[in-house]
UniProtKB/Swiss-Prot annotation:
The gene is cysN. Residues 168-171 are annotated as: G4. Pathway: Sulfur metabolism; hydrogen sulfide biosynthesis; sulfite from sulfate: step 1/3. This is Sulfate adenylyltransferase subunit 1. PROSITE patterns: G_TR_1, G_TR_2. Belongs to the TRAFAC class translation factor GTPase superfamily. Classic translation factor GTPase family. CysN/NodQ subfamily. NCBIfam families: CysN (TIGR02034), PRK05124.1 (NF003478), small_GTP (TIGR00231). Gene3D superfamilies: P-loop containing nucleotide triphosphate hydrolases (3.40.50.300), Translation factors (2.40.30.10). InterPro entries: CysN_GTP-bd, CysN_II, CysN_NoDQ_III, G_TR_CS, GTP-eEF1A_C, P-loop_NTPase, Small_GTP-bd, SO4_adenylTrfase_lsu. Heterodimer composed of CysD, the smaller subunit, and CysN. Residues 25-239 form the tr-type G domain.
Length: 475
């Protein structure tokens, strides 16, 4: 057993007390990214090692692996703790997104070690999509590179507001304060182009030697700020979804018997309470919350992130993909939107193509109306293109086969994030973040039911020669 873990259990008074204490710790999800060979995997290995998260058999195995695959001579190659794929170990690079878990006395952590190579941008975007903080590694010898800018842009595009710029390999520049200051100023100049109000912090460190990772460095007396671990333990993550209006996407209609009909899902944002008046979209029908059912029994209220089942006072038509929100909120359904897209398929995204999309449990079909621009993620300039290639990022106009209820991704990632699915292979080929839902004059919600709208779309798609009118007034 890990000796540090054994000591923690003893201090808490037993396994059960320790597990209860773990449940009450806050959780921080973060990713490490940067240019190739900046030391991302080594940094994670150092965090695991210095927080005593490595079991004795793992440490013994690491000694053996360091002799066979290591790049640090007689020293432990801590990157081998993370680089699990054989291809990664042989090349000394990270290809897949590797997840690791550790905890300290103050917090629990989930780390995503993402690839640095440009051809693995899609892997990096996947890792960033669930994270709240990004550690951007910069080699002190090289300074701010194009890949550093690219990873910064992708992180902020996916809603990450907290950036920790870790200037690594300070031991190779003699722990120079001048080098640290120059890189810090260069990055801040670039960061002015990034969107949103960002919390940016800088830490000079050496992942290989352990300077300023989990303990203060004696080699950099000029730096009086916190270590990287202290930043991770103390950074305040404001959960945007808590303050947002109620959004409850229905994942499953739960009807175990004739006496119970509930709507199961995870509350995406806001809060809901018994007796609250709610509205179902896109139908627009209203009802009251009769019960909030959870695994631990009935509740009077529920908050964002909790998996619940809602029971309403009225028997109304609700199906998977419908959205429940407060009755007094006006949120129109739209049939088109501009979407920031990260393309993940070999076949480029082109105007005129159709894909299935999935958003908050709702699956429908979409058409690519046009590509406004592709972002050159090395310098953040925009250029006109005819199609969006593999790993390309751009702003795309989409039209949907049926009305959807959308939020901007920066406001609500659950109801603003979508994936593209190839209709033939059923493979996920892209990720989208709603930039702006495009409002248009649509039929009143009560005029047509969801079934009538779907049937109308089906007839127009498969039997165009019938000349059926679009109930929503579109061409």
């Amino acid at each position: 057993m890990n000796t540090a873990l054994a000591q923690q259990i003893a201090n808490e008074g037993g396994v059960e007390a320790w597990m209860i204490a773990q449940q009450h710790k806050s959780l921080l999800r973060f990713l490490t990214c940067g240019s190739v060979d900046d030391g991302k995997s080594t940094l994670i290995g150092r965090l695991l090692h210095d927080t005593r998260q490595i079991y004795e058999d793992q440490l013994s195995s690491l000694h053996n692996d360091s002799k066979r695959h290591g790049t640090q001579g007689e020293k432990l190659d801590l990157a081998l703790l993370v680089d699990g794929l054989q291809a990664e170990r042989e090349q000394g690079i990270t290809i897949d997104v590797a997840y690791r878990y550790f905890s300290t006395e103050k917090r629990k952590f989930i780390i995503a070690d993402t690839p640095g190579h440009e051809q693995y941008t899609r892997n990096m975007a996947t890792g960033a999509s669930t994270c709240e903080l990004a550690i951007l590694l910069i080699d002190a010898r090289k300074g701010v590179l194009d890949q550093t800018r690219r990873h910064s842009f992708i992180s902020t595009l996916l809603g990450i507001k907290h950036l920790v710029v870790a200037i690594n390999k300070m031991d190779l520049v003699d722990y120079s304060e001048e080098t640290f200051t120059r890189i810090r100023e260069d990055y801040l100049t670039f960061a002015g182009q990034l969107p949103g109000n960002l919390d940016i912090r800088f830490v000079p460190l050496s992942a290989l030697e352990g300077d300023n990772v989990a303990s203060q460095s004696e080699s950099m007396p000029w730096y009086s700020g916190p270590t990287l671990l202290e930043v991770l333990e103390t950074v305040e993550i404001q959960r945007v979804v808590d303050a947002q209006p109620m959004r409850f996407p229905v994942q499953y209609v739960n009807r175990p018997n004739l006496d119970f009909r509930g709507y199961a899902g995870t509350l995406a944002s806001g809060r809901v309470e018994v007796g609250q008046r709610v509205k179902v979209l896109p139908s627009g029908v209203e009802s009251n919350v009769a019960r909030i059912v959870t695994f631990d029994g009935d509740r009077e209220e529920a908050f964002a992130g909790e998996a619940i089942t809602l029971v309403l006072t009225d028997e109304i038509d609700i199906s998977r993909g419908d959205l429940l929100l407060a009755a007094d909120e006006a949120l129109p359904a739209v049939q088109s939107a501009s979407v920031d897209v990260v393309w993940m398929a070999e076949q480029p995204l082109s105007p005129g193509q159709s894909y299935d999309i999935k958003i908050a449990g709702k699956k429908t079909r979409s058409r690519v109306d046009g590509i406004r621009y592709q972002v050159d993620i090395n310098n953040l300039t925009q250029r006109e293109v005819e199609n969006l290639p593999l790993n390309g990022i751009g702003l795309v106009d989409l039209t949907f086969d049926e009305p959807l209820v959308l939020d901007r991704y920066q406001q609500n990632p659950v109801t603003g994030g979508l994936i593209f699915i190839d209709r033939l292979s059923n493979v996920t080929v892209g990720a989208g973040m709603v930039h702006e839902p495009v409002s248009q004059a649509t039929a009143a919600p009560s005029e047509f039911s969801a079934f009538e709208l779907e049937l109308n779309a089906l007839v127009r798609r498969h039997f165009p020669h019938w000349g059926a009118r679009d109930l929503l007034g579109e061409k």
